[in-house]
Amino acid sequence: MERTFIMIKPDGVQRQLIGEIVGRFEKKGFKLVAMKVMTVSQELAEKHYEALNDKPFFSGLVNFICSSPVVAMVWEGNSIVSTSRQMIGATDPHAAAPGTIRGDYGVSVGRNIIHGSDAIETAKREISLWFKDEEVNEWDATLNPWLYE
């Protein structure tokens, strides 16, 4: 079963959208296997966004992610990386389709509510960066037979 890393950013936490976002993933039939509310250290933020460290917005992004708690999560399900990206919507909320998380709640590129891994390999890297192995739970959801053939 595929896994992905999802983070509700400080703006999503401050706007009290945690339940709404978690609910969307649950209603889609995905399984939450790890979750924690945390204030991100600068070191972790820089590691997480290291692919963007040459961009002019890098320091502002790191400062923003460290400014208030985030909700870090690991979700599991068939094709979850690609499906969750569709659920999240375009990076720029103004370009995100209505019905997506960013389309419904995002305000600007810098305040776009949520992060989701963009590829399976990225998800593996991000999960290992944010969670210890023992923090990710293995459990059988009783609804699996109703979702998967």
Swiss-Prot record:
The active site is at 115 (pros-phosphohistidine intermediate). One of its GO terms (biological process) is GTP biosynthetic process. One of its GO terms (cellular component) is cytoplasm. PROSITE patterns: NDPK, NDPK_LIKE. It is found in: Cytoplasm. Keywords: ATP-binding, Cytoplasm, Kinase, Magnesium, Metal-binding, Nucleotide metabolism, Nucleotide-binding, Phosphoprotein, Transferase. Its main location: cytoplasm. Its EC number is 2.7.4.6. GO terms for molecular function: ATP binding; metal ion binding; nucleoside diphosphate kinase activity. It catalyses: a 2'-deoxyribonucleoside 5'-diphosphate + ATP = a 2'-deoxyribonucleoside 5'-triphosphate + ADP; a ribonucleoside 5'-diphosphate + ATP = a ribonucleoside 5'-triphosphate + ADP. This is Nucleoside diphosphate kinase.
